[in-house]
Amino acid sequence: IDSLYKENNDMIKSLSICVNKFIGSYAFGIINELETDVLYALRKDSPLIIGVGENENFIASDVPSILKYTNKYIDIENDEIVKITKDEVTVYDKNCNIINKEISVFEGDANLVEKNGYETYMLKEIHEEAEVIKKTSEASIDFDITKYDEIDIVACGSAYHAGLVGKYMIEKLCNIKVNVCIASEYQYDKHFYRGKTLVIAISQSGETADTKKCVNIANDMGVDTLGIVNVKGSSIARICKHVIYTLAGPEIAVATTKAYLAQITTLILLAVKNSKEKINTEDLQKLPYYIETLINKDYTSLANMLYTKDDIYFIG
């Protein structure tokens, strides 16, 4: 970038050349020492949004990180170049043409990204699980999966394990063959897609790079795609032909808690709603109560016993 700028003295032109040459995934924030009141940004396959404030603008990877300052944001797509001052945001395509971008507004509760008296985000999010399951189980899920002969679930990490639960429930209740695949491996497999196939992509953030690549492969092959994601307007939500949002709210802690349970609940509901037999959902409605009962137990004595130990073996 520095070398190109010295040649043409034009940051947008220099970044345009870079965008057309760069290989791989990236999201860059760039400052030119000759114009320190301007911030430049560009991305490919890594998340990037622009927060739009009053006399201030921001670059960030996701919306929750800017909610302390503003609830307005702009989604940036692959190969777009952004020039930001405190008063203005200008977006260009890779050929230096200005693009008109829509400003979105986060409609959720900004307090959801605060600790609200809890010592850690993880503890707070554990205590939100019962309400999340209640909201998710009350949501209307009317996507028809019975028209498909086979379903591929692609995901990474905890979302993959949620997919394993989904496989069991869908096969048992809907009599549809389900394959659960780790996204980083699925993208390199040969796909035959015999019959009518649905690819379900599960991701809390909606930005998981490997999962996103799987969706693009399925889309390119003309296969239906369904995203089960937690973040509205995320990349996977935008590229999937269909989307179901889990209602977990922002999850800040690295270790997933409420989002994982919301994914499992969504998959169970998807199976129940498409079941060929009538399913009694009374037990599902009781889940929030059971979760809250478990969470509110006093685990102090157990913690006191464990925290002095050097090693713990989990056998199962």
Where in this protein do the model-derived segments appear?
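Short beta-strand segments
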Residues: 29-31, 41-43, 60, 201-203, ...
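Short acidic (Asp/Glu) and glycine-rich catalytic loops that position anionic groups and cofactors
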Residues: 43, 114-115, 244-251, 268, ...
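Conserved beta-strand termini and adjacent loop/short-helix elements that scaffold enzyme active sites
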Residues: 31, 94, 181-183, 315
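Conserved short alpha-helical segments that host acidic/polar catalytic motifs at enzyme active sites
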Residues: 1-115, 119-120, 124, 131-135, ...
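Cofactor-pocket helix-loop regions in the catalytic cores of large enzyme subunits
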Residues: 19, 137-155, 278, 283-316
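Generic beta-sheet signal
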Residues: 26-28, 39, 151, 197-199, ...
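Glycine-rich phosphate-binding loops that contact phosphosugars or nucleotide phosphates
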Residues: 146-289
